[in-house]
Design a protein with these regions (language model features):
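Low-complexity, glycine- and small/polar-enriched segments
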Residues: 1-503
């Protein structure tokens, strides 16, 4: 039969607070600077492992898997009565989520079965929602709406790991009969993180005198890692896969408010450190009769969108839409490895997903007289993709193809637009993109010679797809106004391939 070592964890956290018109039935009457405030946090650790053990399933499969699914939700519904206060936050929403998921075989362990899976999967959804008051609010100073959704801000961030330890051995020895019964060896770590911060549509609220809207998501550090550090053999295929996916959305759909003069409202996404890596450790042995694939992938989708009032902002008001993204994708093949595909292909890849897309949109419009300010759309993007092969090893696919590649894909779009239907002292839209991309493949740098053999061998570093578009447009209906639009793209690409000591 089959052997399963499985750990499943579902985590849910929520915080809701509402005004006297809220369906939740919570009445908020205290005016203490936090009229509507909601917080939700979640943190979890989930591990499935075999340590110094022997698992043998001669006629079945062996599966070691850890799966965590978490949802964190905070909602604040502003009170539906008149407020008059000098300094206060009408809505303050905060969420945070951190989880650690690991599946591994370590110590002097031996796992043998027709099919072997070592799988770690962590899925997290984080949502923060804040609604503005439904009646008149008079503010002299201070922010009106603050909505923050964060994840992976803990000490270690969001961790997802699947690996075979240095002294462990794993064997998949099944015979594939058809496409539905493929007996392979798979080590896979997959992380999915979705973060959303939003202010729902606030059309026709009336003469609100709000300060600013600050709506933002923050992904701290994700660490997704798959590795074989010991010995792995398969009569079919071997897969070592790490996939890290982040989706961020910050959205202010529409607000109709005569904003306090000088207010800068902002929708912002930040990915502080996204990491996906695959490692074949020093001295590791991988042998497959079929294909061997070691692949690290990052996927990043981030959208910020903000639109100011159809009825106009105050003097020198502005709206900003901003994305700050840092991602790293890496493949590390250690020293003195022995990787052999008897009759198949070997694919060693560090790759950014082609469907990744980052977008900042800021829209300003007004039917009233105002002066100064304008929309700004900005993207700050830093990406590193590396594939590194160490010294003194042997990589052999003599009857198939051998690929060692680092591949980057970039799709950035910033759009700022303002339409002024009446006289404006100035009307300026700005769109800025700053992009830094580094793609590097290195083979046997500064050390003993590595043997590389394939019927067809490709070693390279590539930017396969790069779309960078910054667009700014300003329109003023009346004469006598200063109308400006600025769009800039600063792009720095560094692509290199080095084969120092290989044959």
């Amino acid at each position: 039969g089959s052997i399963t070592v499985e750990s499943v964890l579902n985590v849910n956290a929520s915080g809701v607070i509402g005004g006297n018109s809220a369906k939740k039935g919570v009445s908020v009457s205290g005016i203490d600077g936090k009229a509507s405030s909601a917080t939700a946090k979640a943190e979890s650790v989930n591990i499935a492992y075999v340590n110094n053990g022997v698992l043998e399933a001669a006629r079945g499969k062996a599966s070691i898997s850890a799966n965590t699914s978490s949802k964190t939700d905070a909602q604040a519904l502003a009170p539906n009565f008149s407020l008059s206060l000098a300094e206060m936050n009408i809505v303050n929403v905060y969420t945070d989520s951190n989880d650690s998921v690991e599946a591994y075989v370590t110590g002097a362990s031996r796992v043998s079965a027709l099919k072997v899976d070592i799988l770690a999967n962590g899925t997290a959804e984080v949502t923060a929602t804040g609604a503005v008051p439904g009646v008149t609010v008079s503010l002299v100073n201070g922010n009106a709406v603050i909505v923050t959704a964060t994840a992976a801000k803990g000490t270690n961030g969001k961790v997802t790991k699947a690996y075979v330890g240095r002294d462990s051995e794993v064997y998949a020895n099944g015979v594939t009969e058809n496409e539905n019964t493929v007996h392979s060896l798979k080590v896979s770590a997959e992380s999915n993180l979705t973060i959303t911060a939003k202010v729902p549509e606030t059309k026709s609220i009336g003469a609100l005198k709000l300060g600013v809207f600050l709506v933002k998501t923050i992904a701290g550090k994700t660490d997704t890692w798959a590795a074989i550090l010991g010995k792995a053999e398969s009569t079919n295929d071997i897969f070592v896969l790490a996939t890290d996916k982040i989706t961020e959305t910050s959205n202010v759909e529409l607000f109709s408010a005569g904003l306090v003069a000088g207010g800068a409202s902002r929708a912002e996404n930040t990915v502080e450190s996204q990491n996906s890596s695959v490692q074949i450790g020093d001295g590791a042995v991988l042998k497959a009769w079929g294909n061997i694939q070691a692949q690290a992938v990052t996927k990043t989708n981030a959208q910020t969108q903000i639109q100011d009032a159809a009825y106009g902002g105050g003097t020198n008001c502005s709206v900003e839409s901003k994305n700050n993204i840092t991602r790293k994708t890496s493949l590390v093949i250690g020293n003195n490895v022995n990787i052999t595909s008897v009759i198949g292909n070997i694919e060693l890849l560090a790759e950014e997903d082609k469907t990744s897309h980052i977008e900042s949109i800021a829209t300003g419009s007004s039917g009233s007289v105002y002066a100064g300010g304008g929309p700004k759309a900005e993207i700050n993007y830093n990406s590193t993709v590396t594939a590194t092969v160490g010294n003194g090893g042997n990589i052999d696919a003599r009857y198939g193809t051998l690929d060692i590649k680092a591949i980057a894909n970039t799709d950035l779009y910033a759009d700022a637009y303002r339409k002024a239907a009446a006289a404006a002292g100035s009307n300026k839209s700005e769109a800025n993109i700053n992009s830094n991309v580094t793609v590097v493949t290195n083979i046997s740098k500064n050390g003993a010679k590595t043997r590389i053999l394939g019927e067809v061998t490709t070693i390279g570093a590539y930017i396969e797809n790069q779309v960078i578009l910054a667009k700014a447009k300003s329109y003023t209906a009346s004469a006598g106004s200063k109308t400006e639009a600025y769009a800039t793209s600063n792009v720095n690409n560094n692509v290199s391939t080095g084969v120092d000591n290989a044959w």
